[in-house]
Swiss-Prot record:
Gene3D superfamilies xrefs: 2.40.50.100, 2.40.50.150, 3.90.1100.10, DNA-directed RNA polymerase, beta subunit, external 1 domain, DNA-directed RNA polymerase, subunit 2, domain 6, RNA polymerase alpha subunit dimerisation domain, RNA polymerase Rpb2, domain 2
Catalysed reaction, written as an equation: RNA(n) + a ribonucleoside 5'-triphosphate = RNA(n+1) + diphosphate
Gene: rpoB
GO cellular component terms, A-Z: DNA-directed RNA polymerase complex
Organism: Pelotomaculum thermopropionicum (strain DSM 13744 / JCM 10971 / SI)
Subunit structure of this chain's protein: The RNAP catalytic core consists of 2 alpha, 1 beta, 1 beta' and 1 omega subunit. When a sigma factor is associated with the core the holoenzyme is formed, which can initiate transcription.
Keyword Nucleotidyltransferase: yes
Domain of life: Bacteria
EC number: 2.7.7.6
Keyword Ribonucleoprotein assigned: no
Protein name from the UniProt record: DNA-directed RNA polymerase subunit beta
């Protein structure tokens, strides 16, 4: 049965049957550790690689000695406010040595501002919070592969892949010859390369490979006879057309593979080659005078302490690779699986940054060399030589435009957390969506405990983007490790010793599942145990090497938040995991009644809650800050974020959860953030749900909700939009932010202050002015009168036009904040901008028809109707249902978890506690029924009366079971009892149908219960046994036909809100070429009337409607103006003209050289005019005076055909998780 457990500030009853051996690690340590490594080691490595830089004569030498990072100029909050990058200055100590004179100059050189990672594992770049996603790439090393020739023969290939440098590929052909390709050039016999390495004669080569017949075959194909000839042959292949010499050939080969500056295997490449070829060359040892040694886990022996990995290729590597290839040809050895996580590694922030920094430094190195030759040697200093532009540019480019530097998904805390733990196979040096096949995307057995098999986007990126498992960590080589408990084989007991293994280390071990039953001392209870090796096998207990630490180690955080995951189909679980990340933070967050026990950890590590740094006592609590006197006597002040905007426009607001005088421990949550409730993740609300159809309103996954959810703000959320307006210098003079706007009445200006900026607290609607701004107009020749006015009134009469910032269509709300930045106050602004105003508008959005909702099991739907509370179905005690879901959504989708959640939720609500049911280790059906029974007893108070009456539980349940058998099923019995009651039978007859005997009823009556109470209590007990009860129609009060499943389910409101999607247009921008309205909400476009819609009108014979749609409502430019005028004047709409698309068609045909004319009925040629002529003519006819340079409104076309510039860089366009079903 469940046991209570303290989770943060709340107690949850845990239904888990296994104890947790290992706590979850810090969930964002992937990011933090990687960046820490970069600052401490990564930067130093790059400087060592590039240092020293020598000029072409070898006279001047520039060395990089040491580096320091200064303090950042602004805090994180200030950076967000001012749109600057959170960065610290990097200073490098540089030494310049002049070898001729022996002169040494040292200087500290500033190398640009380096972006810093925040506590939360993110970067602030130009004021926006960004995340660097870790990339899954193929590890450097040697790979063997086999293909089958059309003739049925196995052909083998071996590839040596470096971290950077030339590839070396070996392959065999049908005749068992071995060939090599150097850096993707044409193939040559492999023996040519062996000879070039210094094994010149045939005998030496044959001896090297034990006279293997395949090598002898290859030698027969080899036309070279000595080392020199082989070198020349290779040179000819690599540099065709250049005169080959032995020396140049030797230096080319050396620089390709054996020069650390040009070829780098990285530590991981050396480790992988060593692991595969096992030839013992791993380190280059430094001098070891003190004789200190360390134990090496890879070589399994003591080695000198001062050592470094050999990062370039060696002759042995090449020889051993060919030897292994020969082994494969002789049927020994194994080929590699490139989708195995032992062959794919993670490049996290640190390494990605290091590579980028290296690119910048190598560009700088070229500049330094050039400057060394040009500048005067005597006056030269390090500062003069070093140009930091390329370094700064490389870093800026990486953070600004790399595919792996992403705008952080901040919809809710889970979205933030998951984004930081995301693994992507895309990006530079990775795969591309188009080329990635099935195998790469598929779940692989090596993903177990490392990468979640469930959480991945639907759509083109499926399987290419994954999520790190809960307990996984990254080792020094970038491989993902997962923890196991070691099994003491001698005593056959599972110890608490934790061992982290990578995917290739794990191969060959037998690993038991976490839920294998153990006794008190940790020994296996069963003689045979389920295990992996790597297939699922049943083995004797004494063969087990390791055991999983927890059932949730397989899954990611989002997946492990789904209760009863074990009862859901994987496809639906995937949707559930992804949709939790789209849940909008609600005004009144509520932790789930049925959780999985990791809600607290997820919220804590996401960084949205405030955590006490030290233990102490709370001295002061306000809505904006908390003060704690710590145990050392100092005062710690914690500032809270109030109603700020997240990247996705949701509201970030923190509120204290501690009281004055309360004792606080270090690490305790002291303030809740968005979507958290007492430090636990709270993405939605617990609502009372019934699974039943209702008048067709929940057809096809639609959802019926009660008006109560609207009234009581169950699903109300706050959304904040940011609008900005800048005043720039133009050619005609500076723009001005002012309240003095031409042709605008006082009514419209009522909410602007004297600067022309809207006041905080104003309610605004579409079209309202937020910031008044005027821009100088082109000066025209002035008349004498105007010159006189100008002379009298000065500049004021100058021509300006209104370019104020207005609230866009379809947006409205309250102004919650205004920020003004100006040159005069010393704020950093882009060039040409004098003043910048930002206005923040907040909206309270209640739930409404068209909003998308979902549970945690992939059960999503759109609200079809909001029904008055009194019309909703109600329970026997009169409580109205809050949400009605369609039962048909369950069987075919196979996500039964939602039904179990509803039952357990009901029990938890009645018993008044929260429960946690961890994944694959949660509540069983028995324990759910047990909890429901307890709830029934508690609600009806039956137990105390039974004790008084001397009735025991077994007796009562036995009687009910008998009645159920008689009725045929539990549901049938409920129906029978309800029927008896409503058909006017006596209460006693109804009670007897539940199985109670007259004697039992008498005893209960003596104990103080009335017959009505006894019947009510028995109905509750029947509900507890089936999870179903009779509901009544709120409109008629009649009972529904069958008993219905009712319970509490956790529902989320997703970010696909109807307010963001609904859109209407009367007139608006037109496309430049076709003159048809643009499409889409972003462009304020029209609705597409497509081919099929046209067919429909044709089929109806609606000729005039059709003509209008194809002409005046679309691209008949003149007709549009005339029709508009006719409507305004109340006249009849004139005949349509020629649509622009027809003119375009004619122009296209003419451009093909076809002479196309348009003829009238009497064969007269009709002249097709251009738009400008047309408008001019029309204007004349209508008597409109068009001054020069002014066209009517209609022509103000929006030049972006489809997508506005802002949208080009709008994250939503590039967000990999777009939901295909919703964004059609």
């Amino acid at each position: 049965m469940a046991y209570p457990e303290k989770v943060g500030a709340r107690v949850r009853y845990n239904f888990g049957r296994l104890r947790e051996v290992l706590d979850l690690p810090n969930l964002i340590e992937v990011q933090r550790n990687s960046y820490k490594w970069f600052l401490e080691e990564g930067l130093r490595e790059v400087f060592q690689d590039i240092s020293p830089i020598q000029d072409f004569t070898g006279n001047l030498v520039l060395e990089f000695l040491d580096y320091t990072l200064g303090e950042p100029k602004y805090t994180v909050e200030e950076c967000k406010e001012r749109d600057v990058t959170y960065a610290a200055p990097l200073r490098v100590k540089v030494r310049l040595i002049n070898k001729e004179t022996g002169e040494v100059k040292e200087q500290d050189v500033f190398m640009g501002d380096f972006p810093l990672m925040t506590e939360k594992g993110t970067f602030i770049i130009n004021g926006a919070e960004r995340v660097i996603v870790s990339q899954l790439v193929r590890s450097p090393g040697v790979y063997f592969d086999e293909t089958i020739d059309p003739s049925g023969k196995k052909l083998y290939t071996a590839t040596i892949i470096p971290n950077r440098g030339a590839w070396l590929e070996f392959e065999t052909d049908v005749n068992d010859h071995i060939f090599v390709r150097i850096d993707r050039t044409r193939k040559i016999p492999a023996t040519v390369l062996v000879r070039a390495l210094g094994y010149g004669t045939k005998a030496q080569v044959a001896e090297l490979f034990n006279e293997d017949k395949n090598i002898l075959e290859t030698l027969a194909r080899d036309n070279t006879d000595s080392e020199e000839e082989a070198l020349v042959e290779i040179y000819k292949r690599l540099r065709p057309g250049e005169p080959p010499t032995v020396d140049s050939a030797r230096s080319l080969l050396t620089s390709l593979f054996f020069d650390p500056k040009r070829y780098d295997l990285a530590n991981v490449g050396r480790y992988k080659i060593q692991k595969k070829l096992k030839h013992g060359v791993l380190y280059r040892y430094g001098p070891n005078p003190d004789g200190k040694t360390v134990f090496d886990p890879y070589l399994k022996k003591e080695v000198p302490q001062k050592r470094e990995f050999i990062r370039e290729l060696t002759k042995e590597d090449i020889i051993e690779t060919i030897r292994y290839l020969l082994k494969l040809m002789n049927g020994e050895g194994q080929v590699d699986d490139i989708d195995h996580l032992g062959n794919r590694r993670l490049r996290s922030v640190g390494e990605l940054l290091q590579n980028q920094f290296r690119i910048g430094l190598s560009r700088m190195e070229r500049v330094v060399r050039e400057r060394m030759t040009i500048q005067d040697v005597d006056v030269i200093t390090p500062q003069v030589l070093i140009n930091i532009r390329p370094v700064v540019a490389a870093i800026k480019e990486f953070f600004g435009s790399s595919q792996l530097s992403q705008f952080m998904d901040q919809t809710n805390p889970l979205a933030e957390l998951t984004h930081k733990r995301r693994l992507s196979a895309l990006g530079p040096g990775g795969l591309s969506r188009e080329r990635a096949g099935f195998e790469v995307r598929d779940v692989h057995h090596s993903h177990y405990g490392r990468m979640c098999p469930i959480e991945t986007p639907e759509g083109p990126n499926i399987g290419l983007i994954g999520s790190l498992s809960t307990y996984a960590r990254i080792n020094e080589f970038g491989f993902i490790e997962t923890p196991y408990r070691k099994v003491d084989k001698e005593n056959r007991r599972v110890t608490d010793e934790i061992v982290y293994l990578t995917a290739d280390e794990e191969e060959g071990y037998v690993i038991a599942q976490a839920n294998a039953p153990l006794d008190e001392e940790g020994r296996f209870i069963e003689p045979r145990v389920n295990a992996r090796s790597p297939e699922i096998v049943v083995v004797p207990a004494d063969r087990v090497d390791y055991m999983d630490v927890s059932p949730k180690q397989v899954f990611s955080i989002a997946t492990a938040l789904i209760p009863f995951l074990e009862h859901d189909d994987a496809n639906r679980a995937l949707m559930g995991a992804n949709m939790q990340r789209q849940a909008v933070p609600l005004l009144k967050a509520q932790a789930p009644l049925v959780g999985t026990g990791i809600e607290y950890k997820a919220a804590r590590d996401s960084g949205v809650v405030v955590i006490a740094k030290e233990s102490g006592t709370v001295e002061k609590v306000t809505s904006t800050h908390i003060e704690i006197r710590n145990d050392r006597g100092y005062l710690d002040r914690y500032k809270l974020l109030k109603f700020t905007r997240s990247n996705q426009g949701t509201c970030v607001n923190q509120k204290p959860i501690v009281k004055k005088g309360e004792r606080v421990e270090a690490g305790q949550v002291i303030a809740d953030g968005p979507s958290t409730d007492y430090g636990e993740l709270a993405l939605g609300r617990n609502v009372l749900v019934a699974f039943m159809p209702w008048e067709g309103y929940n057809y096809e996954d639609a959802i019926l909700v009660s008006e109560k959810t609207v009234k009581e703000d169950y699903f109300t959320s706050i959304h904040i939009e940011e609008y900005e307006c800048d005043a720039r210098d133009t050619k005609l003079g500076p723009e001005e932010i002012t309240r003095d706007i031409p042709n605008v009445g006082e009514e419209i200006l009522k909410d602007l202050d004297d600067r022309g900026i809207i006041r905080v607290g104003a309610e605004v609607r579409p079209g309202d002015i937020l910031v008044g701004k005027v821009t100088p107009k082109g000066e025209t020749e002035l008349t004498a009168e105007e010159r006189l006015l100008r002379a009298i009134f000065g500049e004021k009469a100058r021509e300006v036009r209104d370019t104020s910032l207005r609230v866009p269509h379809g947006e409205s709300g309250k102004v919650v904040d205004v920020k003004v930045f100006s040159r005069d106050n010393g704020d950093e602004l882009p060039p040409g901008v004098n003043q910048l105003v930002r206005v923040y508008i907040a909206q309270k959005r209640k739930i409404s028809e068209g909003d998308k909702m979902a549970g945690r099991h992939g059960n999503k739907g759109v609200i079809a109707r909001i029904l008055p509370e009194e019309d909703m179905p109600f329970l026997p005690d009169g409580t109205p249902i809050e949400i009605v879901l369609n039962p048909l959504g369950v069987p075919s989708r196979m996500n039964i978890g939602q039904v179990l959640e509803a039952h357990l939720g009901w029990a938890a609500k009645v018993l008044g506690y929260y429960v946690s049911t961890p994944v694959f280790n949660g509540a069983s059906e028995e324990s759910i029924f047990e909890a429901l029974k307890e709830a029934a007893f508690k609600e009806s108070g039956l137990r105390s009366f039974m004790e008084k009456a001397g009735l025991n539980e077994e007796e009562l349940i036995g009687a009910v079971e008998t009645a159920e058998k008689r009725a045929g099923s539990r549901e049938a019995l409920i129906k029978e009892v309800e029927g008896a009651e409503s058909s006017g039978e006596t209460i006693m007859a109804a009670i007897e149908r539940t199985g109670l005997t007259a004697g039992m009823v008498n005893r209960l009556e003596e104990a103080g219960m009335t017959k009505k109470e006894i019947l009510g209590a028995m109905k509750k007990l029947l509900f507890a046994r089936s999870g179903k009860m009779t509901l009544y129609d709120g409109r008629t009060g009649e009972p529904f036909d069958s008993p219905i499943t009712v319970g509490y389910v956790y529902m989320l409101k997703l970010a696909h809100l109807v307010d963001d999607k609904i859109h209407a247009r009367s007139t608006g921008p037109y496309s430049l070429v076709t003159q048809q309205p643009l499409g889409g909400k972003a462009q304020f476009g029209g609705q597409r009337f497509g081919e099929m819609e046209v067919w429909a009108l044709e089929a109806y014979g609606a000729a005039y409607t059709l003509q209008e749609i194809l002409t005046v409502k679309s691209d008949d430019v003149v007709g549009r103006v005339k029709t508009y005028e006719a409507i305004v004047k109340g006249e009849n709409v004139p005949e349509p003209g020629v649509p622009e698309s027809f003119k375009v068609l004619i122009k296209e045909l003419q451009s093909l050289g076809l002479d196309v004319k348009v003829l009238s009925e009497d064969d007269q040629e009709i002249e097709i005019r251009e738009v400008e002529e047309d408008i001019g003519e029309t204007a004349k006819e209508l008597g409109i005076d068009l001054q020069e340079g002014e066209l009517p409104e209609v022509e103000e076309a929006d030049y972006s055909e489809d997508v506005e510039d802002e949208d080009m860089f709008n994250e939503e366009f590039f967000n990999e998780d777009f939901d295909l079903e919703d964004d059609e």
